[in-house]
Design a protein with these regions (language model features):
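GNAT-family acyltransferases
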Residues: 1-99, 164-176
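Conserved catalytic-core motifs of GNAT/GCN5-like acyltransferases
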Residues: 136-137, 152-169
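A short, internal acetyl-CoA/4′-phosphopantetheine-binding micro-motif in the GNAT/acyltransferase core
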Residues: 72, 86, 99-110, 138
Length: 176
């Protein structure tokens, strides 16, 4: 059985972070659940960003503290995904984005990793004192909807996001 671990990113993963980022850029796939990684070529810059945001140090007013994890397959050290846990809400996050953002690298999709990473982050949500978390997905993302439902998501409605021109489905998961 594969051993998969949530880890906070650090510079020892620089090559893997670069590879992970590049795979998304090459595939034209959005890098969800990892903040500004798409815009940061230097992994050390991104790691510093994640540390600053977890501490809540010098973050923009329209942002909230968040904890960043990478999801690592221990057998080969490959980053399979990223997940970001937002400690609270801004008005935008409360309406559209939720507590959790995540993605699985394109070459590792459809293997159940998204379901597992969302499940594995729930104990950390509990440590933060979150009793329920809101997770959203674009209404056309069937795989993400299934991931959320498998983890106990309860549908709360669909909202139109005018800037991105998409409908977001909102779900709540009780943290046990």
């Amino acid at each position: 059985m594969e051993i998969l671990t949530l880890k906070r990113p650090d510079i020892s993963f620089s090559d893997e972070i670069r590879s992970y980022r590049q795979e998304f850029l090459d595939a034209g796939s959005p890098l969800n659940g990892c903040g500004p990684l798409a815009d940061m070529e230097d992994p050390a810059e991104w790691v510093a960003h994640t540390v600053r945001f977890e501490k809540g140090d010098d973050i923009p007013e329209d942002m909230v503290p968040s904890t960043q994890f990478i999801y690592v397959r221990e057998s080969d050290g490959k980053i399979l995904g990223t997940i970001q846990i937002r400690h609270s809400f801004t008005p935008f996050l409360e309406t559209y984005g939720g507590h959790i953002g995540y993605s699985i690298r394109p070459s590792e999709r459809r293997k159940g990793y998204a379901k597992q990473v969302l499940h594995d982050c729930l104990p950390y949500c509990k440590e933060l004192g979150l009793e329920k978390i809101m997770v959203s997905c674009v209404d056309t993302n069937v795989a993400s909807r299934k991931t959320i439902l498998t983890n106990g998501g309860v549908y709360d409605g669909t909202v139109w996001e005018p800037e991105e021109q998409v409908n977001f489905e909102r779900y709540w998961i009780t943290v046990e």
